[in-house]
């Protein structure tokens, strides 16, 4: 998704309901500092998980412990939410984890600390002359074990 176009679209929607929003952009270092210091009313930013575990979205984005690092941009802290995350990560039973994450989703739906807007598709192409090349569903390109077929 194009962040500038997305911000402008959101700004228009907010204006339509009487909310005046100003779009402000910063260099990355200033942006990170402002996030960590809570110098924002709202923020538009992306997140990409680097593994398939739901905890890789839920914990860094919204747990109490993620506020100091700046990844919890909502600066939202809910002890019930954190307890559910701890229960989910501590169990190896997939069905039990599914039930716990459904409870997590219900809590997020009720409290709405953030609004997911879009999820990007990632495309990756490679030549058939490469042996051992695999597409990683979490992004990144790994060349270990890749060789060129003669």
Predicted regions and their residues:
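Ligand/substrate-recognition segments at binding pockets and active sites
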Residues: 1-51, 73, 94, 122
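Bilobed periplasmic-binding protein-like "clamshell/Venus-flytrap" ligand-binding domains
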Residues: 39, 43-47, 91-128
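Long, cytosolic, alpha-helical-rich C-terminal regions that act as interaction/scaffolding modules
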Residues: 55-56
């Amino acid at each position: 998704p194009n962040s500038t176009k997305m911000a402008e679209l959101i700004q228009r929607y907010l204006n339509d309901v009487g909310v005046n929003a100003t779009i402000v952009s910063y260099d990355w270092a200033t942006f990170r500092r402002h996030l960590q210091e809570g110098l924002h009313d709202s923020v538009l930013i992306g997140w990409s998980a680097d593994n398939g575990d739901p905890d890789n979205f839920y914990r860094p984005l919204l747990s109490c412990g993620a506020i100091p690092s700046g990844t919890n941009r909502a600066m939202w802290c809910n002890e019930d939410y954190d307890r559910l995350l701890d229960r989910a990560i501590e169990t190896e039973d997939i069905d039990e984890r599914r039930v716990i994450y459904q409870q997590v989703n219900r809590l997020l739906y009720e409290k709405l600390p953030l609004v997911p807007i879009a999820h990007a598709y990632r495309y990756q192409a490679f030549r058939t002359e490469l042996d051992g090349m695999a597409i990683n569903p979490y992004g990144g390109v790994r060349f270990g074990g890749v060789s060129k077929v003669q």
